[in-house]
């Protein structure tokens, strides 16, 4: 990758990623699945290249099982506020999140 007088292309990619974080609409909600078990579902991150890493970090930080499937992150248990707080700490705009 070449550099110009405005900075490296890597810094441009970082800027674009930050702009993407600002325009994403994230919805965090509780759902009931098999056998009456609660799960936390996160939508709106499917366009992100690092959605697998985000899923792994959420599972590790919250201490629960989960998966990324069909454009949704699904975590075992009701962790809506914890997910919101972790995403805000990761740099996502709190105003772009809807917690139901």
PLM regions: where:
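A generic structural motif
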Residues: 72-76
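Long, charged, low-complexity intrinsically disordered regions
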Residues: 1-56, 60-61, 67-69, 81, ...
